[in-house]
């Protein structure tokens, strides 16, 4: 459907019977109203032409071919030239000048003999109908399927049912109570005093006051909240058996919480109906829309048989049972058998349920091969449904798809793009650059160069890709982080490389997941990708505000291993006179570079303890505990200088106690980790300074 601004959109919701009639009924040029499907037949199997008023009727849904009507007779009759109309056949009622593609969107309708409850709003969880009526789904199931009847309140007027002691709005068995009143006027009694099936549910929904439901539900919710607070405040010491009281208290709390949840749902549903101007009784169908025939096709085989969509079989069942109900209502003899008419209405309800959703019921309707029919819900839901397969899953130009693999060496805003995909996606940009740089004289020569895949092609392609972001998307795109922008990097593999930290936003892992690649073409799309969609700009979850790019378990284990230190500590230097091994002395280094060079030359290990000269101030307040940390050992030298050795650092002091130098206890792994942190902070500080300078210039 289209809104006032002519923007194409799709909205799923409830509509009134009048709106269904406006969509599916129309007036022919001769003044006849068409749109109602009255017969279950589809094609005449002798001529393979659509049957009049059937599921493929050309009067209702439009012609199969332009200019050819259903009667296939000459258009011009010599004796009827005055009444001749080239756009309409007066004999069969088919409009000839209409495009046959109209059979893809022109609808019909079935006028149901009895109202039918919509299964989506009754059997799905939560049940809209059950919650609004403040009943359980099990309580409503018998009235919906005509197993019990509901007595109607008729004010103070005497009724036959009231003489038997029945109270208004009470469920009673159809066969037991109605058998007393069988007569030729039974139809009048039924219409006045009892109701069952969708008609009874529709009357109850029509009598609801939505604003009153909201007010009363809120008052009851507050009362239950007060009761729960009282239960929590009661001391258990007042009761002799605490265990039994605790069980009773927990059961009572669970019951109250379930009631609170139901009240919240009732208020929310009532607000939805009020906000959208939708009536609750529209959840009960009086008119059943019939899909356009091209959306439920029927094909003729070469052998002479016909294959058809499952929807046609389900529609035929609905029409057949609906016609049976109409036939029973027209004959007065039907009222002599009390169970006959309700059973027929129950069959109509079950047929419509199978048409709308064949998977909710206890026993799905099956074909002759014991295969469940595909209902309307099956055609639109899931990965192969109409929305995800045909509407959202269309093929797009300048796009590709491949499996994702981990790329830990990439930056957060980079992704590895296979050469085969990159040269196809950026071929237009590549041809333009080759011609502009005069590497190729024309378009044809540029294509030959690209086909040869020479080194110059890859160099030009790298330069193009550095300036052009790409979009990565993983279906299903449930939130805005499902599609993000990256700077592509050429790789020789055939899979897309992705940084592991961005997988949380995509809800992806590396067990065979695939991602789609898109190239933004317009300048607006490229600006949006750079300013809003880059992965390093989307580090916070849009729903709850928590960080979404957090270190994974592999990273944490790697950091733990790289910063691990051997357990000996400074006691590694202690002298053992009885030991046959030589005394081990931890090496000392003047700078980061000296320690890293020693590690590269394999003189020390990654976790070997070492002393590193530290030119900065040591914050002893962090190291000292409440009792103030004392030196573990003090070593004196012959010239009067001495070392104060602590657990993680040592200080060399002069004769009068002045500090000469400081060394900290660390490892090569910790040095590398500290350097990475310093470079990251320095880069962030430089980025902030540049941003401030840019703002100052502006």
Swiss-Prot record:
GO terms for biological process: DNA-templated transcription. Zn(2+) binds at residues 69, 71, 89, 92. Its EC number is 2.7.7.6. Mg(2+) binds at residues 509, 511, 513. Pfam families: RNA_pol_Rpb1_1 (PF04997), RNA_pol_Rpb1_2 (PF00623), RNA_pol_Rpb1_3 (PF04983). It is an enzyme of class 2 (transferase). It comes from the Eukaryota. The keyword Metal-binding applies. Its cofactor is Mg(2+); Zn(2+). Binds 1 Mg(2+) ion per subunit. Binds 1 Zn(2+) ion per subunit. It catalyses: RNA(n) + a ribonucleoside 5'-triphosphate = RNA(n+1) + diphosphate. Keywords: Chloroplast, DNA-directed RNA polymerase, Magnesium, Metal-binding, Nucleotidyltransferase, Plastid, Transcription, Transferase, Zinc. GO terms for cellular component: chloroplast; DNA-directed RNA polymerase complex; mitochondrion. It is found in: Plastid, Chloroplast. GO terms for molecular function: DNA binding; DNA-directed RNA polymerase activity; magnesium ion binding; zinc ion binding. Belongs to the RNA polymerase beta' chain family. RpoC1 subfamily. PANTHER family: DNA-DIRECTED RNA POLYMERASE, DNA-DIRECTED RNA POLYMERASE SUBUNIT BETA. DNA-dependent RNA polymerase catalyzes the transcription of DNA into RNA using the four ribonucleoside triphosphates as substrates. In plastids the minimal PEP RNA polymerase catalytic core is composed of four subunits: alpha, beta, beta', and beta''. When a (nuclear-encoded) sigma factor is associated with the core the holoenzyme is formed, which can initiate transcription. This is DNA-directed RNA polymerase subunit beta'. It comes from Cryptomeria japonica.
